[in-house]
Swiss-Prot record:
Alphabetical UniProt keywords: ATP-binding, DNA replication, Nucleotide-binding
Gene Ontology CC entries for this record: DNA replication factor C complex
Matches recorded under SUPFAM superfamilies: P-loop containing nucleoside triphosphate hydrolases, post-AAA+ oligomerization domain-like
Biological processes per GO annotation: DNA repair; DNA-templated DNA replication
Gene Ontology MF annotations: ATP binding; ATP hydrolysis activity; DNA binding; DNA clamp loader activity
Coiled-coil intervals, chain numbering: none
Similarity annotation: Belongs to the activator 1 small subunits family. RfcS subfamily.
Binding sites annotated in the UniProt record for ATP: 43-50
Organism: Methanobrevibacter smithii (strain ATCC 35061 / DSM 861 / OCM 144 / PS)
Name of the protein: Replication factor C small subunit
Pfam families reported in the protein's UniProt record: AAA (PF00004), Rep_fac_C (PF08542)
Length: 315
């Protein structure tokens, strides 16, 4: 295995982007034009925001894209100095063999408010020579003056079928055997995050020559979906002690964290409602309890105590 698979199998062209067809179709209109508006890509991690941005830059700027492209991660450079120095100095330079320059700011929702206001001023000042592509997980953390200056593209989680097809393609390319159960397990744990899926696949493949369920569970340290399902079924049927014992076994033997356990409980409950196996009014009450449990664990409360308290709400 040579290098990270997320880089080796990263799509290089807009046509190869997975799971964001409507967005790609809209972006294709900018290719070949002499101008591009400021763009904002928003959505969860691992759904192709950075990959799409770089593919778009290559398509628009052509062979001179490296000379006219600046990529910064706002998590590493959060402050106003980055805007005043790196971005301003780059924007002042004339484009080389291209109509304009492009600045890509990743995780811009981690920038301070002062830095965002400074960025807004740079976006106004260099409209004729540079365009910005901003990427964030939460657009609500971006100040309104920046949002109003961008065409906003909202990326959604990648469908399970598309993730599964990509994983099978990688396994075939790397000459690794896989089972449908192994691919389904990765799909379940990825929750629409292609980057996570590929990373788990590579980690599972390093355990042996076949990617199966056991190899996946070995590397993710999360509860098996069936165990979570059985736990909730016991709680709903009134068997609190049975559910409690299964919870403890799952957290100790499989090394599942409290936050992951809450997330998996939420997944199972949501699936039951979607399949018509749980009444909506019961679901509403449980979601409130799950949200409260999640908040308390993230605030530092004992995960096992909070999860056992959560199980009492299922009775």
């Amino acid at each position: 295995m040579s290098g990270p698979w997320v880089e080796k199998y990263r799509p290089q062209n807009l046509d190869d982007i997975i799971g964001q067809k409507q967005i790609v179709n809209r972006l294709q209109k900018y290719v070949g034009e002499e101008s591009m508006p400021n763009l904002m890509f928003t959505g969860p991690a691992g759904v192709g925001k950075t990959t799409t941005a770089i593919a778009l830059v290559k398509a628009i700027l052509g062979e001179y894209w490296r000379q006219n492209f600046l990529e910064l991660n706002a998590s590493d450079a959060r402050g106003i100095d980055t805007v005043r120095n790196d971005i301003k100095n780059f924007c002042r330079l004339k484009p080389v063999g291209a109509p304009f320059r492009i600045i890509f700011l990743d995780e811009v929702d981690n920038m301070t408010k002062d830095a965002q206001h400074a960025l807004r001023r740079e976006m106004e000042m260099y409209t004729k020579t540079a365009s910005f592509i901003l990427s964030c997980n939460y657009s609500s953390k971006i100040i309104d003056p920046i949002q109003s200056r961008c065409a906003i593209f909202r990326f959604g989680p990648i469908k399970g079928e598309e993730i599964a097809n990509r994983l099978k393609y990688i396994c075939t390319s790397e000459r690794f055997e896989y089972t449908d159960g192994g691919i389904e397990a990765i799909e379940y744990f990825a929750e629409g995050d292609m980057r996570k899926a590929v990373n788990v696949l590579q980690a599972a493949a390093s355990e042996g020559k076949q990617v199966d369920e056991d190899a996946v569970y070995e590397v993710v340290s999360k509860a098996k979906p069936q165990d979570v399902h059985n736990l909730i079924t016991k709680a709903l049927s009134g068997d609190f002690m049975g559910a409690r014992n299964l919870l403890r076994e799952t957290m100790v033997l499989q090394g599942t964290s409290g936050e992951d356990m809450v997330s998996q409980i939420y997944q199972d409950v949501s699936k039951r409602v979607f399949e018509g196996k749980m009444e909506a009014d019961i679901y509403i009450d449980l979601i409130e309890a799950i949200a409260d449990c999640d908040f308390r664990i993230r605030e530092g409360a004992n995960p096992r105590i909070q999860l056992e308290a959560l199980l009492t709400q299922f009775l």
